[in-house]
Amino acid sequence: DELVEYACYCGNYYGTPRKYVEDQMERGRDVILEIEIQGALKIKAKYPDALLLFVMPPDGETLKKRLSGRNTETPEVIEARLKRASAEADGIESYDYILVNDDLEKCVDELHSLIACQHWQVKRNLDFISRVRGQIKEF
C-alpha cells in the first residue's frame, strides 16, 4: 500500500510512492506522473478527478526513429518497446486528452494549458462560485 500504482513495463517494475503523491496534493500542487496505461488506470480508479493525458508521436515512424536514434537500446529492446507502444495505443480511449509530441515546446505549452483548464472546472470551484454568487445577491 506504499505505492499508489505500479506496473511491469518491458520487463522492469516501476511504481509511484503514495506518500509523495498525497503530500504534493495536500500542498495544492499538481502531480504529473509519467506512467503507462496500467498505472494510469489505477490512478484514475483511486483519484477519479485525475487528468489522464496520452502523449504520442505524430506518427509511428517517428516513434521508431526516436527509439533507434537514442543508441541506448538493443534492437530487441526497441522491438519490445514498439510492441508495448502498440498495446498502449489500444487504450487511448481511456484517457481524457492526447498530446502530440511533434514539437517539444508546443507539447509542453499544450500540457500546461490542459492542466490550467482543469483548475477552472465548475466542479472544482464551487466554493468560489458560491461566495461570488452570494456577494452578487447582496446588491
Residue spans of the language-model regions?
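Ras-like small GTPase catalytic G-domain
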Residues: 50, 60-62, 68-90, 105-106
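Conserved AAA+ ATPase "sensor/coupling" helix adjacent to the nucleotide-binding pocket
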Residues: 1-4, 66-73, 114-117
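Conserved catalytic network of the ASCE P-loop NTPase/AAA+ motor domain
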Residues: 23-26, 44-48, 90-92
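Conserved phosphate-donor/acceptor-positioning beta-strand/loop module used by diverse small-molecule
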Residues: 31-36, 45-69, 100-101
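Short, flexible helix/strand-to-coil boundary loops that buttress conserved ligand/catalytic motifs
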Residues: 1, 44-47, 66-67, 96, ...
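ATP-dependent small-molecule kinase phosphotransfer cores
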Residues: 1-31, 37-41
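NTP-dependent small-molecule kinase module
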Residues: 72, 90-139
